[in-house]
Curated annotation (Swiss-Prot):
It catalyses: (2R)-2-phosphoglycerate = phosphoenolpyruvate + H2O. NCBIfam families: eno. Keywords: Cytoplasm, Glycolysis, Lyase, Magnesium, Metal-binding, Secreted. It is an enzyme of class 4 (lyase). (2R)-2-phosphoglycerate binds at Q152, K326, R355, S356, K377. Pathway: Carbohydrate degradation; glycolysis; pyruvate from D-glyceraldehyde 3-phosphate: step 4/5. Binds a second Mg(2+) ion via substrate during catalysis. It is found in: Cytoplasm; Secreted; Cell surface. Catalyzes the reversible conversion of 2-phosphoglycerate (2-PG) into phosphoenolpyruvate (PEP). It is essential for the degradation of carbohydrates via glycolysis. This is Enolase. One of its GO terms (molecular function) is magnesium ion binding. Its cofactor is Mg(2+). GO terms for biological process: glycolytic process.
Amino acid sequence: MTEISDILLRTILDSRGNPTVEAEISTISGGFGRACAPSGASTGIYEAKVRPCDEAVADAYINLIPKLIELDSADQRGFDDTLHEVDGTSDLSGIGANIAVALSLANAKAAASTLNMELYQYLGGAFISQTPLPLGNVIGGGAHAVDATDIQEFLIVPTGASTAAEAVFTNALVHKRIKEILIARGKGCGKGDEGGWAPHIADLEAFEIVNEATTKVFDETGIEVRMGLDVAASEMWDAASGRYVYKNAKRTTEEQIAYIADLTEKYNLIYVEDPIQEEDFEGFARITEEVSGRDTLICGDDLFVTNASRLEEGIRNDACNCVLIKPNQIGTLTDTFETISLAHDYGYETVMSHRSGETTDNTIAHLATAFGCCFMKSGVVGGERIAKLNELIRIEEHF
């Protein structure tokens, strides 16, 4: 019933106008799954490797697809094991991580469709009853914008929202209020890759603006909205000098830790992603300890790249208390699930995330719900972002 009967691959556009891979899988009983590979602008050095799309698709039709036809789509681990076997490398550079993630997710969706189940139900089971809160980028800089803030993402999460719909609309309202504040201050209102505003302002002013906007929204709605950051510190790190290079400062690791800890206290940050460069497990452990008296999540993205082996090293070093989950970093749903399971076993929170180069694929809303992630990081506005946010609203209607 769940046997794979047909697989199609194609090259499509992502939100930055770059090519990416889309996969479609059909089963003999009429099940169907479609999924797309996203891409990042600031990528970790340990991420699985992508291949040029047209070349990877052509190779897959010759060397990979024939070995997937007639597999049981309900055997996700078996499907993903076949991807690894054909690939033959440790980083998916053989078939390409973009091919692997599109096929792996499409396979799970095809199996769920065959069984007439929603993907989150198929993966998460009968007792799933809660969606994650949306974590959204409202001011962007770093690798996502030109001549904007040093910190890559100024984030918000509506901790006071009682439903997914309320949370999604609250984040959108903060985004609107930020535009109004920027206009009032005479600042430009361009947007970065993920839909956050990308004004030519310093980090300090960005903090002030987001704080003002969240206060306005609380006064209007009574819903508390907390701030977070994606520092993307690896993008600032200069190994030659041993400094984190900002526009107006160069900080040692000690100074970076003190700076982030001060921001966390001053702005009551609920979430700080990649405050330290991706090779420094000790630095991550020190900042995690520094803020341990607060409810702040110190999240590893480039540090862990959704890789269970990297996470095991983090656990040994007491680095972080949260893991960012990006399926395309590791390439398959099975590997993604294993990293999430390991994180939860050791008390780490997990955050399911989009990439800066996205499509209208909404799969991560289902994964975030099925796997018990506390947040879904997916932007606030833009068609490729709201596709995921609106899916959260739809999913919650089933509870």
